[in-house]
Amino acid sequence: MEGAGGANDKKKISSERRKEKSRDAARSRRSKESEVFYELAHQLPLPHNVSSHLDKASVMRLTISYLRVRKLLDAGDLDIEDEMKAQMNCFYLKALDGFVMVLTDDGDMIYISDNVNKYMGLTQFELTGHSVFDFTHPCDHEEMREMLTHRNGLVKKGKEQNTQRSFFLRMKCTLTSRGRTMNIKSATWKVLHCTGHIHVYDTNSNQSQCGYKKPPMTCLVLICEPIPHPSNIEIPLDSKTFLSRHSLDMKFSYCDERITELMGYEPEELLGRSIYEYYHALDSDHLTKTHHDMFTKGQVTTGQYRMLAKKGGYVWIETQATVIYNTKNSQPQCIVCVNYVVSGIIQHDLIFSLQQTECVLKPVESSDMKMTQLFTKVESEDTSSLFDKLKKEPDALTLLAPAAGDTIISLDFGSNDTETDDQQLEEVPLYNDVMLPSSNEKLQNINLAMSPLPASETPKPLRSSADPALNQEVALKLEPNPESLGLSFTMPQIQDQPASPSDGSTRQSSPEPNSPSEYCFDVDGDMVNEFKLELVEKLFAEDTEAKNPFSTQDTDLDLEMLAPYIPMDDDFQLRSFDQLSPLENSSTSPQSASTNTVFQPTQMQEPPIATVTTTATSDELKTVTKDGMKDIKILIAFPSPPHVPKEPPCATTSPYSDTGSRTASPSRAGKGVIEQTEKSHPRSPNVLSVALSQRTTAPEEELNPKILALQNAQRKRKIEHDGSLFQAVGIGTLLQQPDDRATTTSLSWKRVKGCKSSEQNGMEQKTIILIPSDLVCRLLGQSMDESGLPQLTSYDCEVNAPIQGSRNLLQGEELLRALDQVN
């Protein structure tokens, strides 16, 4: 038993010794292996700090890659580098916009340049020897295998096998936008544009030791260029580069202005146009595939292609396109392109598309040249052609707009004959031009040119059907077949008198129009439904609150507002014309002073009183028989008294601006004109409205009961003071205090109510509105007699209404007698 136990102990001791020897042998082998790997690592063309920290697997991987590279270099016909080439080797990688990568036919990266760390964040030794499929996007693996395949089949005669490769590859990148390095597990995908070719190398010893022929070695040599994101472009863009943005269907939504200098296109004309319209036809297939890759991988570089210039020819361009994704839903939003123009315009005389023919058929000229040629040939062109050209070129009209400090020269609307404007105005009385169609063709042309209404609205006879202010007018209103009249107004003449010394300054600085005919515009009967007489009340009333002045609602006739009630028990002291003081002198504009047959300054030196008297004789009345009776109504507007200090004219208080604008009118300005005028003359009314209406009837015509009922209704009113009497009348008043210059006279507004009766539905209405102006006040305040026109008091204007066929107005007891006879 003891012998058996001793034998077992010996066996245990021997086994332990063997194990210890085995461990020592293994330790010795590992140490020798480590020494070999250490020596092998230092033989690799790597920095010492890199090679000293490599593990055995890395050393083997790098060594195998190095041996393969050496095999490729030995297989190729390499020239002996001289000293100059050796010095230039260090600059090659700096000149590249990417890194160099060499792949075997199975996808191993046997070589990669050391500048890969600059673009991808991964170091050279981390990638060398690894398979490219470990670092690329899974969706690109199939395309990558196709690029690595070299087909050795038969090639058609006369054609060489294509060994060029160009594709886009998504590879892992550990660089952040700030240039920092992240973990490989958090790496993002960066698009690389890989261009290169396949090389097939035959070794020097074509046969192995066993007598078998070795297959040629195939590798893919690539230059990988990362496509920068537009938001991370570090290098400033030069003058040969322009940016563009496109929708997902490749239509321009933005383009840089530099494209104008490079290709001739204006950025505005490219918006909404597809970029395919400007590609050269031979490059369309290549660009279509490139755009397909862009939507698949997010970024592409088109390479050099031809893009058509505007006036013919093409330029070579290289574009970097990037798809911009929405940060919320990660959906593609737009495409941003950085376009590098690498050449000038080539074959600029050659036309490639229809867009380029537009410049040949329609040469583009500058706006300045067009306007110069247009106005230098204006004598030989008619007005219609000039209007058409100006209408087609609205942008060119801005060249004609006056700038600050320019001298404004009033245009002469008269003819080119030897007759002056004074002689033209002498031919026809001025009121005929203002209120009635002129018989003079020259004056008609002037009126048409000054009219703010469209040219299609030709002047028609003035008619009115809504002013039964006088008893005789009311009688004619109720008649079934009234007659219409055409009135002609004249002014008495006096001798020429020189104006006061202060008139010169007024003439020089006055920006007013040339004649009173420019202060009016007429409204045709076609506008009756929109431009009713109640609009005049709302337009010139101080307390109006109407929001819509052009109201088309019909209102009943307010009979109490047509004429004042004059009680018989009160004895009003009515004054005749000879008891009134003559008109006072006023300064006139040079245009009004030239019209000798119509207006002349008087001898008075006081400021003018805004009065007007019109006499219609039987010789001047023209009766025209028609189906219905048409009224003739004239609404004349006057400004405040001239002795009130005037403020500088503005666009809202004057119907004409300093530059001669004709856009302002009572019907357009509305309430704003009255408000501005009230601010400039707060102590006096701004507009005095006078309605003159006259008819001819048979003297023996009797009033029917309707007239009596109308007058009875009128007499129910009471007169509290003069102001209320003025506002109640149907005819506005003209009053002024000639002896008191310090106080301003309150002027009343004409209040008119109008409607259409059933018998007058077909009648046509025409209203003449004379816009308020100081010039009109001065013009109308002057007459042609040595003794000026008499000043009318409030009672004269209200009571002494002109009756049929009479040149003189009833006065005093005769008027009271006439009123008693009516009752």
UniProtKB/Swiss-Prot annotation:
Compartments where found: Cytoplasm; Nucleus; Nucleus speckle
Residue span of motif Nuclear localization signal: 715-721
Location of the region described as ID in the Swiss-Prot/TrEMBL record: 576-782
Superkingdom field: Eukaryota
Chain intervals for the UniProt region annotation (Interaction with TSGA10): 1-401
Cited SMART domains: HLH, PAC, PAS
N6-acetyllysine, modified sites: 532, 706
Annotated positions of the 4-hydroxyproline modification: 402, 564
Keywords: Acetylation, Activator, Cytoplasm, DNA-binding, Hydroxylation, Isopeptide bond, Nucleus, Phosphoprotein, Repeat, S-nitrosylation, Transcription, Transcription regulation, Ubl conjugation
Example GO biological process: regulation of gene expression
Cross-link (Glycyl lysine isopeptide (Lys-Gly) (interchain with G-Cter in ubiquitin)): 532, 538, 547
Biased composition (Polar residues): 493-517, 651-666
Its biological purpose: Functions as a master transcriptional regulator of the adaptive response to hypoxia. Under hypoxic conditions, activates the transcription of over 40 genes, including erythropoietin, glucose transporters, glycolytic enzymes, vascular endothelial growth factor, HILPDA, and other genes whose protein products increase oxygen delivery or facilitate metabolic adaptation to hypoxia. Plays an essential role in embryonic vascularization, tumor angiogenesis and pathophysiology of ischemic disease.
Description of its domains: Contains two independent C-terminal transactivation domains, NTAD and CTAD, which function synergistically. Their transcriptional activity is repressed by an intervening inhibitory domain (ID).
Subunit structure as annotated in this protein's UniProt entry: Interacts with the ARNT; forms a heterodimer that binds core DNA sequence 5'-TACGTG-3' within the hypoxia response element (HRE) of target gene promoters. Interacts with COPS5; the interaction increases the transcriptional activity of HIF1A through increased stability. Interacts with EP300 (via TAZ-type 1 domains); the interaction is stimulated in response to hypoxia and inhibited by CITED2. Interacts with CREBBP (via TAZ-type 1 domains). Interacts with NCOA1, NCOA2, APEX1 and HSP90.
Protein name (database record): Hypoxia-inducible factor 1-alpha
